[in-house]
Amino acid sequence: PDKCIRCLRCIEACRQVQGIGVIKLDHTGTNAAVSFGGPWGESETCIQCGQCALVCPTGALAVKDQTDRALDWFDDPAVTTVVQFAPAVRVTIGESIGARPGENLQGRIVAALRKLGADCVMDTRWSADVTIMEEGTELLERLLRQKEEGTLHGHPDTMFTSCCPGWINHIEKNCPDMIPHISSTRSPQAIFGALAKTWLPKSLGIPAERIRSISIMPCTAKKDEAARELLKHGGEPDVDLVLTVQEFAAMLDRRGIDLMSLEPAEFDSPFMSEGSGAAQLFATTGGVMEAALRTVSALAGGPDLGRIAFEPVRGLVTFKEAEVETEAFGKLRIAVVHGMRAADEVIRMVREGRSPYH
């Protein structure tokens, strides 16, 4: 609280950008201050999105740092560390080290993790492909059912993607009536974590208890996802620890590792490290939806969809839509939203029976 300068950016991000409003002001006028009296993350409406910490200029709000724990595991010979990192990380890490915008640093990240002490370094794109096959198949089944029922066009049974943990928290806490519209597929992080604790130990010939599964993600909310009870087996989490890109950059700095001076290295296991172009789309806003739609078209025997042209809805950059012509289902309408406030607009459409999106 002593670091708070009353800029109110956190309140603005929570209330205006996300539409949640869990952060409050204490008092009024010159005595106004952000309330630090209650545990926001434990409130009934906080979605653990991390946007408040993102905009805080002084560090009064900060992400829970887990770098010490990760470094301890890297240094422990009795522990086998398995690290995955998301497609976006290979580009976003460059912002912290002065690399060219958009430069792909995948190989150097792998080399840096080995230098830190990671035993296995693998690619989240592999589990992203698993997610897409599951989610694409689920969407295909929904479309086939609606086609048979004659409800495919007009106001279809809209399906939402399920990879964003902040979005899932928002649905569960604030819009539980929308749960039937959410894909049942786990996120790539969760799928990878489950396999890292089950299949991988057998493949490596070591006890599962030795594995510590670490992921590097571009989103703070992934920390909350890893702690979900539904993503544990025998009381132990599938993903033991999540580092943000900022935490990873801080670890490199602490150990004196210059990312740009390293020779690029390859991932450890091709079985859990090869990904398709569909998986690469996960790094972009709306990429999961686009990958699922392209998978549906392929599974239904249709041609490549080509470039999908999105148009802003009512001029909003946070809400865009597109019509896609498919061989099996005719025209399908899709939407991409950025931020919970924009997502709430689609939720209202679904509730009122006027959503045109599939």
Q: Over which residues does each language-model region extend?
A:
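Iron-sulfur-associated redox domains of electron-transfer enzymes in respiratory
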Residues: 62-358
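Short N-terminal signal/transit or membrane-insertion segments
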Residues: 12-17, 24, 56, 89, ...
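Non-heme iron-sulfur electron-transfer modules
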Residues: 16-45, 59-81
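Cysteine-centered iron-sulfur cluster-binding motifs in ferredoxin-type domains/subunits
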Residues: 1-17, 38-59
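Short charge-dense sequence patches
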Residues: 2-8, 22-24, 54-65, 141-145
